[in-house]
């Protein structure tokens, strides 16, 4: 297929976004001779590995084999849902080998690597998922060594676990930890989601929304500075101000903790002097960018009413009816949010979140689709 237009490389960087959009539009509208669209799974900007994989499955005749090496984000990212559906519902996805980013399977490639094996035509009933794998488990005789960790995903349970998105959970290597993750998934899969208006906390009929912090740290950098006692400005909360101490998550900011060392990173970029004002009420916030090596992924904390939030922090926009319900039950909105934060920081929900995480960003979609059981339904995961 020849794409129309002038695709000269002599363009300024400001034009690249428009070029990508035009390329995406043309590829999405590319049709076969019978009028059907050639690519059914393209969403947003063109992603070459998705395009190559879909085209490969089209070109190989039924019962032929397709093997491809792609980023392992395909297993869980939202934008790959249409491609996973095609692999499951119209083809036989037989195996996947997942190598996490720390294995450095290819020199210079820092992201995780996934090896897919697909038989074209038919549909998938069972897929054997190997991982997390180590580079030393690759075998020149059999592909993988016999003791490589794996799990079999069967269609009935897989459908329930993912609500038809066909994501593949990220599993730990340790057998005991794997059982804990599977137990958490099985216990939570049928629970209502946080953003569903039918959940136990929300009688309003209005969904709980997840919002990104109001201050873009790049665009407003001139209005963000080091915290200085007595200086003009209000507290600026970003991801680094979330502190974990045991099982407790709290905000560690010099405006609320005078013992923070003068050289501490919590003091840098901690003061806001721009025109956007604090919301005037406490909020329940979650760190949006996490270190993959941390034991915990979900880090919820209540932020005070006199601060603003950076875009490395997400927060819940709760309907008035939910806030009133929390205040009535716990004495105040602030105390109610503290109770809710402890619930959302439960071990069970964190196991779920780590299993389905696509990357190091805790995005709005992930939080909105988080299972939301009642507190009495949360229990310790042990095997």
Give names to the regions the model predicted:
Residues 129-131, 142:
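Trafficking entry modules
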Residues 70-75, 102:
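Conserved short loop/turn motifs at secondary-structure junctions
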Residues 74-82, 379-381:
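Catalytic palm subdomain of template-directed nucleic-acid polymerases
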Residues 1-7, 11:
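Single conserved hydrophobic/aromatic residue that forms the stacking wall/gate
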Residues 37, 46, 50-53, 57-60, ...:
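Polybasic, glycine- and aromatic-enriched phosphate-binding surface used to engage nucleic acids
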Residues 9-28:
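Flexible glycine-rich, low-complexity coil/linker segments exposed to the extracellular/periplasmic environment
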Residues 79-96:
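Conserved Class I S-adenosyl-L-methionine
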Residues 26-41:
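Short glycine/proline-rich turn/loop motifs
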């Amino acid at each position: 297929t020849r794409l129309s237009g002038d695709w000269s490389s002599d363009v300024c960087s400001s034009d690249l976004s428009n070029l990508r959009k035009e390329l995406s539009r043309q590829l999405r509208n590319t049709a076969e001779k019978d009028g059907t669209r050639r690519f059914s799974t393209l969403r947003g900007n063109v992603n070459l590995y998705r395009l190559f994989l879909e085209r490969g499955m089209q070109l190989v005749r039924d019962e032929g084999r397709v093997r491809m090496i792609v980023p392992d984000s395909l297993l869980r990212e939202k934008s790959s849902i249409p491609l996973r559906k095609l692999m499951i519902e119209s083809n036989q996805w037989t195996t996947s080998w997942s190598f996490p980013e720390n294995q450095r399977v290819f020199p210079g490639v820092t992201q995780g690597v996934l090896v897919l094996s697909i038989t074209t035509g038919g549909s998938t009933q069972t897929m054997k998922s190997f991982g997390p794998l180590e580079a030393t488990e690759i075998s020149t005789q059999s592909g993988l060594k016999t003791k490589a960790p794996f799990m079999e995903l069967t269609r009935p349970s897989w459908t329930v676990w993912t609500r038809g998105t066909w994501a593949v959970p990220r599993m730990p290597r340790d057998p005991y930890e794997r059982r804990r993750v599977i137990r958490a998934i099985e216990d939570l899969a049928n629970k209502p989601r946080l953003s569903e208006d039918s959940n136990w906390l929300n009688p309003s009929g209005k969904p709980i929304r997840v919002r990104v912090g109001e201050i873009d740290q790049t665009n407003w950098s001139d209005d963000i500075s080091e915290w200085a006692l007595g200086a003009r400005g209000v507290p600026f909360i970003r991801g680094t101000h979330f502190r974990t101490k045991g099982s407790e998550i709290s905000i560690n900011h010099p405006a609320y903790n005078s013992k923070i060392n003068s050289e501490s990173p919590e003091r840098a970029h901690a003061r806001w002097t721009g025109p956007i004002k604090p919301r005037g009420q406490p909020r329940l916030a979650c760190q949006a960018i996490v270190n993959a090596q941390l034991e915990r992924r979900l880090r919820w904390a209540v932020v005070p009413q006199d601060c603003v939030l950076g875009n490395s922090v997400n927060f819940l926009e709760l309907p008035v009816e939910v806030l009133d319900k929390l205040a009535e039950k716990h004495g105040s909105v602030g105390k109610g949010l503290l109770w809710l934060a402890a619930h959302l920081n439960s071990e069970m929900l964190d196991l779920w979140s780590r299993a389905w995480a696509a990357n190091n960003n805790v995005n709005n979609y992930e939080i909105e689709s988080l299972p939301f059981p009642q507190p009495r339904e949360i229990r310790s995961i042990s095997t």
